[in-house]
Amino acid sequence: MKSFYKSFRTPSFLALAVAAALAGCAATQDAGHSAMNMVKSATGQAQVVRQDVAPALYQVAYSPSEDVVYAVSAGNPKDPASGVKPKLFKLDPETLAVKAEIELPKPGYGLTLDDDAHRLYIVDTRGGTLMVFDTTSSQVTASLTMPPVLDAQGKPEKIEYREIVVDKANNRLYLPAMSYHDSKLQVVNLETLTVERTIPGFNFGATGISMDSGAGKLYVSNLMGQLFVVDIGTLAITDRFEVQGDQLLTLVMDHDNKRLLAVDEGFDRLDVVRKERGGLNYQTRTQGNQVLALDPSSGKVLQNIKVGTQPVDLLLDAPRNRLYVSNRVSGNISVVDPRTGQEIKTIDLPTHPNSFALNPKTGTVYVTVKLPKEKSMTDKESVARISF
């Protein structure tokens, strides 16, 4: 998700709020990691294995067919002479030892896996390049640089990419294109690897996306408390809801309970960004630091789930009734019962726990853990394995 923390004046400052994809700045105590720790609670224990891997780690994926963990590193694009190259890592799912590392042609940030097709889709958040990685040959087999998006004056707009959703039934990818003004949704045709449609109208900071393929709907959220519904058949926005939430960074569909789960981040400087960069006269609705359960048909808040400070990513393990939330600033993972909203346990993972992946067979969770921004591009960041 990540540094983008130089000043409010830099165009990429919007990505400060997108810490699930990009690096951040708040610093707490950290150390090297290669050992197993036991996290105790009244409901049992969690075993945590943590291993340093590489600088600039972002998203992670687990492949059931290969039984490996993939983690992507952006390298150090600001200092090519540093020798820190963008890479994709294959990790042992038990020990997290590096089994292979493959250099990428562009920095990798966002990552999603189509395991049946043996494909990883990797996006360069800043440069807008989508890479197709064949997991059988361990090679990037194709790439697409997103076309420029023009603003109202016909000038190229600064766009950043974070999440990728695979629509296998329609052979498409969906990528929110985040901007300060009119965010877009890019629809990529996988047969031709071209942009099939650019859908405008998602306003300031569209980041969250989730698909309900059974209902034929996409849900997209932004950083000004709005939830959009897109019809997958027509690729039209059919609804827009004003949610009693503020920074809807990440979305997950809870199919069993027919609701959406949304991070309400609580990034303390976003109001300044909305005003100075977005030109918005926006009234803050909440203080954030929570997960919202939403009615997808209306955007109504059904439940407020308090978590740690500045949550960024969500992972729902529905068969085991566990919702995992990475809390960036408090440096921990909240494990929540999604039915009741009650916290099951808290797992400390300083400095900044980031993005999740799940082994659906065992329930083992993998999470990238980032360092403070001054170390993120040079020192090794880690991947943690959580099991019960």
Q: Which residue stretches match the model-derived regions?
A:
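Gram-negative bacterial Sec-dependent N-terminal signal peptides
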Residues: 1-27
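Predominantly soluble domains enriched in secretory-pathway, periplasmic, or organellar proteins
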Residues: 25-388
